[in-house]
Amino acid sequence: MKLNKLIYGVLTIFAFSSCADQMEYSEYNPYDAGYVKRTFYDVGGLVSNIYQSLDSDFGNYSGAILGSATDESQYSYTGNAIETFYNGAWSPVNAQSSMWTSCYKAIANCNNYLEEFTGLTFSEYEQISDYEAEMYRYNNYQYEVRFLRAYFYFNLVRQYGDVPFTDHVLSTSEVNTLTRKPAQEVFDWIIKECDEIKDLIIPDYNNLGALVPSGESAETGRANKRTVLALKARTALYAASPLFNSHQEGSQGYKELWYRAAKANKELIETCEDAGMRLIDDYENLWDAKSYSIAIDELIFGCRAIRATNSFEKYNFPVGLENCRGGNCPTQTLVDAYELKDGGERPDKKADYDKNKPYYEGRDPRFEKTIAKNGDTKWPNWNETALETYQGGANAEPLSGGTPTGYYLKKYCQTSINTTTAKPTTDNHTWIIYRLGEFYLNYAEALFKYLGTAYATNNEFPIPANEMVSKTRRRTKVNMPKFPAGLDNKLWWEKYQNERMVELAFEGHRFWDVRRWKEGDKHFSSIDAMKIYKSGDSYSYRRVTVNRQWDDKMYFFPIPQSEKAKNPNLTQNPGW
């Protein structure tokens, strides 16, 4: 009943709110606003509605994930919309994202809430036993909403660069006249907003004691202080990166942005560690169906699906298994990134390296947790036969949807989910938005760029980048060698990028990391696949390079033509 009441309150009020994707504005119906203001539950429902706009990527492009527009993977079916990112069909008319629409709608809802629903007293409920707890939760909503608004602005700037900006409900005269605010100014605003609310928002929902309203679970998916600091830290990293940092490398302005990024990531890490957070032992538990409990030591913020499903598994479990489509297939390019456990180097750094050999033995343990390969057993765990990804095999080409790369995706798939018609099962999925592992890497990158080498320290930053980057490698059940001493800057930077690709694979980072580094032509102009052939009991391998289109205009998305038609003040991104 409570859930229905929340949803009803949400639908009642937002049926009359502005449609932000069109930047249009309509006044609230006063009766409906007043109706929602009567109860804690209905006002809370408005905030819950905004949380539902958080982004995830369990196959946003008809099963394809954004990773398949990068060198992480290739979608196994031709003609999917994901190909638009690299086949020349991308354009303002074919803008390939709902981010503009969804973010501006969410921002409008945030502005509406902050202007219309703060400062309430709920005096009719003063005599209930948990009035104090309900008011404590209610008074926190405004800080959650301010975080969410800043979060949506970050997503917009990351994708479009300069964007229209408003922190209030638009008047009729303001509609469709907004100009684009410089990206760096929006980043500055996000960081300032995070600083203003970080000590006001609830620090930790698991330590509320008597301030937990009756009937409520202490565990929530809501923003807390660490979430706010995570947004600040990631924003500072992006603001300092080449795509947004217009200062000459090595200049004072350049270093100031990297200093801010290092300081912000250090602040988050120290806050997390002070709260007892750490890297969990089992890498794969980060995306387990119960990650919200068994990975809570590392997870800072995530977006949990509202119900148990099996659609992601149907899209990505190997072709040849019942009701499975193959989907997003990891590339040989990604496989190459997993280093050898003995020595901590990529196979292609070996003196006797042969590009047509896969070097599966002795690899970084994260490889087998992320990627399914030929001969793997119990993938998924109800499959009783070894995978056959060689040409003509049971899970391979020429079957429709057979892996074009030689591999299948494991990460984010729940291995226990059964997709058969006779025994179908479902389970929970949580999209990782922020986790501690990312910020150790962010901090290492910022330190390296600010201090100039991976081994430098000072009084404020006593731990060098080289030690910080090794933390994800030293996870108990990963236990890869630390980064070595004595690497020059070029080699260290390449090794750092490789570590980031491996640790954060398929978590939605690669698409944006390569863009903020302005290295699109280097990484996204081709991918490698591995064609496998069987003869008797032996296998042979042939590396295949698949070319893709890259143009530097792709560092930012095009502004949708439909939005430009509504607002003549919107300028288009360069090249589009």
Place the predicted regions along the sequence by residue.
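Bacterial Sec-dependent N-terminal signal peptides
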Residues: 1-28
